[in-house]
């Protein structure tokens, strides 16, 4: 995928580590990740395929817990001077990594160390921009980028008297369908959602073209004041809180736990990452895909990337950097990207892979599978929809989750929850400056 350079840049400023004294000794590269289920199987499959394609380097995938746990493990390992070669960091952790100058080596630089030239024009623009510095330098490699979508149980829709081939498009339509599903007994629960922070606040802002925070949600400056207690957010979360009172909406957890409520048949609708598709398919449920719901008069605008990217620490050996470059080049190959996209639901990060998938009529044969790509690429981003970048976004998400959980537990209404989240979140952001 990348262009091979005639000369390879020498490693500068890194601490050389001894890998082995024997000539042609294989260099092991630990890849710490947070993938489970079908996505963990894909990590193992790709690692095995790369290892069998050459003999100099060996990728060793290691599951380190969920996304936040993997990020924390990587930071702790770097501080103890024992970092992995590659660390998978979820979208919310990007600001943390970007702020750690000197601790990481940009992906573009790693590729040059391995003799490759990175050409950002070969990648989906929205993904490249999200993981790059303002000057365009690619900081991390976009392994599994995703967009949130609506999954729905076609059998439950049919039992409830809803059109199984017509998923709801707006949030009011989702809420009405959820009530009808529960009232009819088609499913015990009408609607659930994974990642209330990423989907229902960050992407909610982008998709409905409303501010998440000041300074273009942190992309124009680090001094950010949250704006997630404006009227549209309050209306949206109060509707969810009201549905939760009788179980029409069920809360599964802070990350992807709610996916189990859908794949088990308990809840008939789910907003979740496109990358959750592998487990949905594996469950055997009769599912359909719809675009992320929006509010009339506000959306749809564009979604922002989720999922995760691969980061490389400073202080590795020349051989490790060269091996990582070879692995990134392997992951960029069109056939690998097509496989990752078609099997997992994650986006094809290269334009070549996207075009190849279209040419094969995959999207015609699999309705809805192009939806997450079209959502992200459909419109030119506005200052509200370029993304969210906070140096402590994982911490801010924790604060929001605490307030959402109190709201869903009936301890406070949506306005109180969001007002508290803004007050506490702003204090945390200011303290992190």
Swiss-Prot record:
Keyword match Lipid metabolism: no
Subcellular location: Periplasm
Keywords: Periplasm, Signal, Transport
Cellular component terms (Gene Ontology): periplasmic space
Binding site for sn-glycerol 3-phosphate: 67, 91, 146, 273, 307, 346, 397
Protein's UniProt keywords contain Signal: yes
Signal peptide: 1-25
Family: Belongs to the bacterial solute-binding protein 1 family.
Subunit record text: The complex is composed of two ATP-binding proteins (UgpC), two transmembrane proteins (UgpA and UgpE) and a solute-binding protein (UgpB).
Primary role: Part of the ABC transporter complex UgpBAEC involved in sn-glycerol-3-phosphate (G3P) import. Binds G3P.
Name this polypeptide is given: sn-glycerol-3-phosphate-binding periplasmic protein UgpB
Source organism phylogeny: Bacteria, Pseudomonadati, Pseudomonadota, Alphaproteobacteria, Hyphomicrobiales
């Amino acid at each position: 995928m990348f262009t091979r350079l005639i000369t390879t840049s020498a490693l500068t400023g890194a601490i050389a580590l001894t890998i082995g004294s024997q000539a042609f000794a294989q260099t092991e590269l630990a890849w710490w990740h947070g993938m489970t289920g079908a996505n963990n199987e894909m990590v193992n499959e790709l690692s095995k395929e790369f290892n069998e394609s050459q003999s100099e380097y060996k990728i060793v995938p290691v599951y380190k817990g969920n996304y936040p746990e993997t990020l924390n493990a990587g930071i702790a390992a770097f501080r103890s001077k024992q970092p992995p070669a590659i660390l998978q960091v979820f979208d919310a952790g990007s600001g943390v990594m970007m702020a750690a100058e000197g601790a990481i080596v940009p992906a573009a630089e790693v590729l040059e160390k391995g003799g490759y030239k990175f050409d950002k024009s070969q990648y989906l623009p929205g993904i490249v921009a999200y993981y790059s510095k303002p000057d365009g330098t690619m900081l991390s490699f976009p392994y599994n980028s995703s967009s949130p979508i609506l999954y729905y149980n076609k059998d439950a829709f049919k039992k409830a008297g809803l059109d199984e081939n017509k998923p709801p498009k707006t949030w009011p339509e989702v809420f009405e369908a959820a009530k009808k599903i529960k009232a009819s007994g088609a499913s015990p629960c009408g609607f659930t959602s994974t990642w209330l922070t990423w989907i229902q606040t960050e992407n909610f802002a982008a998709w409905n073209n409303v501010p998440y925070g000041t300074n273009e949600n942190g992309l124009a400056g680090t001094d950010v004041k949250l704006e997630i207690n404006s009227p549209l957010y309050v209306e949206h979360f109060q509707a969810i809180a009201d549905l939760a009172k009788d179980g029409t909406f069920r809360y599964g957890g802070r990350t992807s736990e709610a996916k189990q409520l859908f794949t088990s048949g308990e809840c008939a609708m789910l907003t979740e990452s496109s990358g959750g598709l592998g487990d949905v398919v594996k469950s055997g449920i009769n599912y359909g895909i719809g675009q992320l719901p929006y509010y009339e008069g506000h959306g749809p605008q564009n979604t922002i990337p989720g999922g995760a990217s691969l980061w490389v620490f400073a202080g590795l050996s020349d051989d490790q950097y060269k091996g990582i470059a070879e692995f990134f080049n392997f992951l960029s190959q069109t056939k690998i990207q097509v496989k990752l996209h078609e099997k997992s639901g994650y986006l094809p990060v290269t334009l070549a892979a996207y075009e190849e998938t279209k040419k094969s009529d995959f999207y015609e044969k699999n309705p809805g599978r192009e939806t997450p790509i079209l959502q992200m690429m459909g419109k030119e981003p506005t200052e509200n929809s370029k993304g969210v970048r906070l140096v402590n976004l994982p911490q801010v998400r924790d604060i929001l989750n605490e307030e959402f959980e109190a709201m869903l537990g009936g301890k406070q209404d949506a306005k109180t929850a969001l007002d508290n989240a803004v007050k506490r979140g702003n204090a945390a952001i200011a303290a992190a400056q």
